[in-house]
Amino acid sequence: KYIAELDVIGMDFENGRLDIRHAYQKMSMCIRKFVHEMTDIKVQNYTLRDIGTLGIPDVYSLVAEYYAPEFARRSEGDVRNSLARTRSAIERWI
């Protein structure tokens, strides 16, 4: 279901229904929900620092990648690459 959620984010971005900032926000929520389901750790409201203490480097790396596009005054990022990295991280876990 999380891979399908990423596919929808990708399609919505490609079709102009999501801008960069919102695409990254949705990716962040997707990976956080996935981690919660897999570990029972409620990471939905964790800061990047909190996530760093979990010992899950893939998740830390992804959320760190999302931070600038999510919160910067001007969002920049490679949504397609980030979607692929997120998809790959989820596939390695399942």
Describe each PLM feature range.
Residues K1-E14:
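Charged alpha-helical initiation segments
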